[in-house]
C-alpha cells in the first residue's frame, strides 16, 4: 500500500488530533466532552449525562482552554464565535432553515460523520426555476407555510462546496432609499483563504398576493451615483414567474459577490425590478414578491458557496499554532500534568499485555460539543463519533492488521531486534469528513465541511 505525501500529512494531522485527546481523556470520563471505549461505555456515558452526571474534572482551566483552542484551530477558527442576539425578527430563520436543508441534503450520518452516496433529485431543468420541498426539519416550523426549493445547479454547488454561508439582509442598510425591494448584504465576514465558487440571492414569492399574470423579475446591481445623480444599475439575473409559482426564487449573484469582495466600496446594494411581459413596470409587492421588513421569516437573503485554498489554510493554521506555542513559552512552558492512571489510552502499552483483545483496531470516541458549552453557536451536530486507533502491531501481522509493506518489514526486524527497531504504530489509514452548521460572530449561518475528522479504518504503519 503506497501513500502520497499529502496522505501522510493528513494522517499526521489526525494523529496529532488523536494524541491531544488521548493525553487528556479516556473511558474513565475524566472530562465528559469525550467518551471513548466500546458501545456499552458510550451508552453508560449518555445515561450519566441524561441524569446530569458530572464527574470531577481532572484538568486545570489552562488545560481546558488549550484543548478548546486546539479544537477550534482544527475547525479553522481563530476564536470561539460569539454571535450577537438575534436581530431583525424572523429573517434569520430563513437563512438557518436553508442551511439546515443543505445539511440534510448532504445526508450526513452524525454518528459516523460519513456522508451518504445518494443525492437529492430536484427534478427540474432551469437553473433558477422554483422547486418545492416540504420541511420536516423542525426549524421551518417558525416559517409556517414556507417551502424550501432546490435547483440542479444548487445541488451541485452544495456537493462541491467546502463552506456554505447564508447572509441575511444587513439591517443597518436594509431599506435603501425607503423601499423594501432595495437591500444590502454585509460580506465583510467572508472567510479568508476560501474562493467563492457560487453565490445566489433567494427572494420569496407569495402566489396568493397577485392576480393571474406572468411577470419578469430582474435583479440589478446598484452602483455609486454618478455626477448626474443616477445609479446606472447593472443587470445580474432574471426569471419569469406565473400565477401559481409560490416559494423561493433563486438568482445568480456570483459576479456581484466577486466584485464586492474585490472592491468592498462598490457594495451599495441590490434592487429588484418587476415588469409585465408587455414591458410595464409593476410594484414588486403587487407581484407577490416579499421584501425587507417582512416578519414571517420570508425576507430576502444570500447564500455563498466556497472552496478552501488548502495551502493558505494550512499556513494560517501553522502560524496560529506557532503564536500560541510562543505565548505558552513566555508564560513558562507547558504546565506539568499528573499521570492519569485511570486513562487506559495513556497507559496503552501496559494494558495491552493484559488484554486479550490487543490487536490494532478502531475504537469509539465521542466528541460532545454541548459539554464545551458551544451549543450557543453550533447548530448541528451536537457531537460526533470521531473514533481512534489503538492496539498492538506485533509479529506476526494478520490480514486484519491492514498493514503497509513497510510495517510488515519493520515488524519482522523488530521481532529479531526489539531493542533497535520499534513496532509499527496503530494509526488511521482512512479518514472521512464531518459537516458542522454554526453561527459566526455576525450571526451569519455557516455550513462547513471538515476533512479527516472521523477514523474510518485503522492499520499498522
From Swiss-Prot:
It comes from Strongylocentrotus purpuratus (Purple sea urchin). Residues 317-351 are annotated as: Disordered. InterPro entries: Cystine-knot_cytokine, TGF-b_C, TGF-b_propeptide, TGF-beta-rel, TGFb_CS. Keywords: Cleavage on pair of basic residues, Cytokine, Disulfide bond, Glycoprotein, Growth factor, Secreted, Signal. Residues 31-338 form a propeptide. Residues 338-347 have a biased composition (Basic and acidic residues). This is Protein DVR-1 homolog. One of its GO terms (molecular function) is cytokine activity. Homodimer; disulfide-linked. Disulfide bonds join 360-426, 389-458, 393-460.
Amino acid at each position: 500500500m503506497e501513500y502520497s505525501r499529502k496522505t501522510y500529512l493528513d494522517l499526521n494531522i489526525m494523529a496529532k488530533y488523536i494524541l491531544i485527546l488521548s493525553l487528556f481523556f479516556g473511558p474513565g470520563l475524566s472530562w465528559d466532552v469525550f467518551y471513548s471505549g466500546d458501545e456499552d461505555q458510550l451508552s453508560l456515558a449518555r445515561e450519566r449525562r441524561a441524569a446530569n452526571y458530572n464527574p470531577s474534572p481532572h484538568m486545570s482551566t489552562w488545560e481546558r482552554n488549550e484543548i478548546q483552542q486546539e479544537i477550534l484551530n482544527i475547525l479553522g477558527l481563530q476564536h470561539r464565535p460569539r454571535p450577537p442576539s438575534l436581530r431583525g425578527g424572523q429573517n434569520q430563520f430563513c437563512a438557518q432553515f436553508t442551511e439546515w436543508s443543505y445539511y440534510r441534503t448532504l445526508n450526513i450520518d452524525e454518528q459516523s460523520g460519513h456522508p451518504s452516496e445518494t443525492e437529492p433529485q430536484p427534478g427540474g431543468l432551469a437553473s433558477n426555476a422554483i422547486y418545492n420541498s416540504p420541511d420536516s426539519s423542525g426549524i421551518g416550523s417558525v416559517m409556517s407555510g414556507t417551502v424550501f426549493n432546490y435547483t440542479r445547479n444548487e445541488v451541485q454547488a452544495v456537493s462541491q462546496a467546502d463552506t456554505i454561508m447564508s447572509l441575511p439582509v444587513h439591517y443597518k442598510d436594509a431599506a435603501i432609499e425607503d423601499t423594501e425591494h432595495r437591500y444590502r448584504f454585509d460580506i465583510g465576514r467572508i472567510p479568508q483563504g476560501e474562493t467563492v465558487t457560487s453565490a445566489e440571492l433567494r427572494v420569496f414569492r407569495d402566489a396568493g398576493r397577485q392576480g393571474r399574470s406572468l411577470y419578469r423579475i430582474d435583479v440589478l446591481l446598484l452602483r455609486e451615483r454618478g455626477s448626474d445623480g443616477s445609479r446606472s444599475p447593472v443587470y445580474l439575473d432574471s426569471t419569469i414567474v406565473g400565477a401559481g409559482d409560490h416559494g423561493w426564487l433563486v438568482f445568480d449573484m456570483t459576479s456581484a459577490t466577486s466584485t464586492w469582495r474585490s472592491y468592498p466600496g462598490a457594495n451599495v446594494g441590490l434592487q429588484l425590478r418587476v415588469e409585465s411581459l408587455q414591458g410595464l413596470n409593476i410594484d414588486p409587492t403587487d407581484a407577490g414578491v416579499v421584501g425587507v421588513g417582512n416578519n414571517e421569516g420570508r425576507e430576502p437573503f444570500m447564500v455563498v458557496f466556497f472552496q478552501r485554498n488548502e495551502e493558505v489554510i494550512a499556513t494560517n493554521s501553522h502560524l496560529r499554532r506557532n503564536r500560541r506555542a510562543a505565548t505558552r513559552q513566555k508564560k513558562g512552558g507547558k504546565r506539568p500534568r499528573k499521570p492519569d492512571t485511570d486513562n487506559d489510552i495513556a497507559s496503552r502499552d501496559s494494558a495491552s499485555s493484559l488484554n486479550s483483545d490487543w490487536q490494532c483496531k478502531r475504537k469509539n470516541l465521542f466528541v460532545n460539543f454541548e459539554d464545551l458549552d458551544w451549543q450557543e453557536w453550533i447548530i448541528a451536530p451536537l457531537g460526533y463519533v470521531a473514533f481512534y486507533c489503538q492496539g498492538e502491531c506485533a509479529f506476526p501481522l494478520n490480514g486484519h492488521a491492514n498493514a503497509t509493506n513497510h510495517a510488515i518489514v519493520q515488524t519482522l526486524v523488530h521481532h529479531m531486534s526489539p531493542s533497535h527497531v520499534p513496532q509499527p504504530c496503530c494509526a488511521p489509514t482512512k479518514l472521512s469528513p464531518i459537516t458542522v452548521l454554526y453561527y459566526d460572530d455576525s450571526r451569519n449561518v455557516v455550513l462547513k465541511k471538515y476533512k479527516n475528522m472521523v477514523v474510518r479504518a485503522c492499520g499498522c504503519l
